[in-house]
């Protein structure tokens, strides 16, 4: 075996190893108990976020389900140019929480989690709980009011306070 073949084989093994590290979504997205049975680390991260920010785990998990269907690398669909060609994405939303670039930077700065990754479940659920905790203070929403917390999450607290969610078909 020559050196080039060994390099190609090594690269292939490395890529296969890295691919196995990528988390696929849970099989039954509608059953939080099954999700947590399959992903014990997710349960621990969700409970840690609940303790830290005071937002119920069920609320935070519902947001991640709605935003990304538990896909680590989720992005908004691209707009189409001339009905065929893929264009730009409508926003910078990315990851489990579909957090925008600017909001994620604010989270990193204000939460003390400066090395957070939007494709990390534990970072994403902490982000969702952090954002919801801020919404309870800024927009006077109860911690267990998932519907109004989601309106504030989707529209931003400023949009929520202006009532922009009322004009949308949910």
Please report, for each region that a protein language model flagged, where it lies by residue.
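C-terminal motif of bacterial Sec signal peptides marking the signal peptidase cleavage site
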Residues: 17-20
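Catalytic glycan-binding domains that act on GlcNAc-containing polysaccharides
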Residues: 24-170
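Bacterial N-terminal signal peptides that target proteins for export
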Residues: 1-9
